[in-house]
Regions:
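A conserved pocket-lining segment of Rossmann-fold NAD(P)-dependent short-chain dehydrogenase/reductase
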Residues: 144, 195-206
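Flexible, glycine-rich beta-alpha linker
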Residues: 173-194
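N-terminal export signals
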Residues: 1-21
Length: 206
């Protein structure tokens, strides 16, 4: 059921209409206001689901004002989530395994399913095609929490493990998307290139 909600969010722009969910869900979104989150939320709302955002309230605080907000911090300031129940949680802002473990442990008894948005960057190598069982990158120091180009993938892999360890494989869904592009992409990792190519002439490309 969570996959259908997220699938509508990620692929909904390709659909002529958004189908209403047979069983509307109460969904908690950790993060949810930067790039992917608002698109996901709009389509989940269109399907009839009820959303709650949990975040620090700093990034795009005015986006989707009709959605309930609980302000807090992944770094231990989770009190606003206590005593509440949802049908599923979508972790859209988990980059450090300690943060993922904290939220998963708090929510395990009140939210039956944990969906973690990971990344293809978890894989140790791209020399061959990867699948769910392919080796993931590892950190020399598992206590590192600084997120940069070298640690991003391994930290996401450790975060996946944290979610599974707390919720168990049956109640955990891990998504490993590749490069996501589209409206409001704040990274400009892809959109620059077709725009530059459309201008014509020679240009350097990676």
């Amino acid at each position: 059921f969570v996959m259908s909600a997220l699938g509508a969010a990620v692929a909904g722009a390709l659909l002529p209409t958004v189908l209403r969910a047979e069983q509307p869900l109460r969904i908690l979104v950790l993060g949810g206001t930067r790039f992917l989150g608002p698109h996901m939320a709009e389509h989940a709302l269109a399907r009839g689901h009820t959303l709650t955002f949990f975040n620090r309230g700093k990034t795009n605080p005015g986006v989707l004002p009709s959605v309930e907000r609980i302000q807090g911090d992944r770094n231990g300031q989770l009190d606003g989530l206590k005593g509440r129940k949802w049908d599923a949680v979508i972790d859209n802002s988990g980059y450090v395994p300690r943060h993922v473990r904290l939220s998963a442990e708090l929510l395990k008894t009140s939210v039956p399913h944990y969906l973690f948005i990971s990344t293809v960057s978890v894989y140790a190598s791209f020399a061959a095609a990867n699948d769910e069982d392919s080796p993931v990158g590892k950190l020399a120091d598992a206590t590192v929490e600084k997120v940069d180009g070298e640690t991003y993938g391994p930290l996401k892999a450790l975060s996946e493990s944290a979610a599974r360890e707390v919720y168990g494989p049956a109640a955990t869904t891990i998504l490993r998307p590749g490069l996501i592009v589209g409206p409001d992409d704040n990274t400009d990792r892809f959109t620059y290139w077709p725009a530059r190519a459309a201008r014509g002439g020679e240009f350097a490309a990676p």
